[in-house]
Regions:
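Bacterial N-terminal signal peptides that target proteins for export
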Residues: 1-11
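Boundary at the C-terminal end of the N-terminal hydrophobic targeting segment
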Residues: 21-23
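A short glycine-rich, His/Asp/Glu-containing loop-to-beta-strand
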Residues: 30-57, 62-66, 116
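Histidine-centered metal-chelating micro-motifs
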Residues: 53-56, 92-104
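Ligand-binding loop in jelly-roll beta-barrel domains
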Residues: 71, 98-121
Length: 125
């Protein structure tokens, strides 16, 4: 019984480590696509640029607001292996809850976004 408990604990810790290593700060793991425009104690503002077909490694963001600078199509793959395609029009702004993903520009034009990451806890009303 102890051996089974030990094995399950070790497997759980290994899985958690893999997930944490895969979901990292996008600026650190993909500086080609993510640039910091502004940062203070409350927010970090990122400029995101993907050429057609570009893909990023798995990373995570806190709660954020995305402002789309052009019409675009993207595919997001999540840590559980599921994926979804999304589209946005130039000038749209969307709330994006905290989470990890692996984005890919599946459109035929560059993908340009300004992402405002919130550093504090978001109060639910």
């Amino acid at each position: 019984m102890r051996k089974l408990t030990y094995t399950l604990t070790a497997a759980t810790l290994a899985l958690m480590t893999i997930v944490l290593l895969r979901a990292q700060d996008p600026v650190k793991v993909d500086s080609k696509h993510y640039k910091v425009l502004f940062e203070n104690d409350q927010v970090r503002v990122l400029r995101i640029h993907y050429a057609p077909g570009d893909k990023s490694p798995m990373h995570q963001h806190p709660d954020s607001v995305a402002v789309f600078l052009n019409d675009q199509r993207a595919k997001f793959t999540y840590p559980d292996g599921k994926s979804e395609e999304t589209s946005a029009k130039a000038g749209e702004a969307k709330w994006t809850p905290a989470g990890a993903h692996e984005p890919e520009n599946v459109g035929d034009k560059p993908l340009e976004v300004v992402l405002v990451e919130l550093k504090g806890k978001v109060e639910k009303k």
